[in-house]
């Protein structure tokens, strides 16, 4: 189960990345991620999202990892935009709770396993560049 959720998180992230190119709506990334995750009988956490990277570490735009029904209202990708794609995928439901003890630790509401993967993406003239790709990931 743990390996499955890790693979679904990674594979959904990569499918989202492969969608990146100038001229598409940002929401199209979330749609492809969410569709894949649901096809694997998993869910995408809705309380957290990817984000823009620039002068401030976490900035707009928010990168939603599911179809929120507002794709046409989402930003259109342009060369030079930099953001993260980082789906959090659960084996159970999408709801999460934050610890009352430390105010930081997050668990799934139904206590199911969860996994997250993340890359930082640069929109190029013809597609994308993965800025955080490690050498050992090149052949995966």
For the regions a protein language model found, what residue spans apply to each?
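Active-site neighborhoods and metal-handling regions in enzymes and metal-associated proteins
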Residues: 1-140
């Amino acid at each position: 189960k743990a390996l499955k959720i890790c693979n679904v998180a990674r594979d959904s992230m990569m499918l989202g990345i492969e969608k990146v190119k100038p001229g598409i709506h940002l929401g199209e990334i979330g749609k492809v991620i969410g569709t894949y995750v649901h096809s694997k009988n998993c869910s995408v956490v809705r309380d957290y999202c990817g984000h823009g990277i620039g002068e401030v570490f976490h900035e707009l735009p928010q990168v939603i990892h599911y179809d929120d029904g507002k794709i046409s209202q989402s930003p259109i990708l342009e060369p030079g935009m930099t953001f993260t794609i980082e789906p959090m995928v659960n084996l159970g439901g999408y709801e999460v709770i934050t610890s009352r003890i430390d105010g930081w630790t997050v668990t799934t509401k139904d206590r199911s396993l969860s996994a997250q993967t993340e890359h930082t993406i640069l929109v190029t003239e013809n597609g994308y560049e993965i800025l955080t790709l490690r050498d050992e990931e090149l052949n995966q």
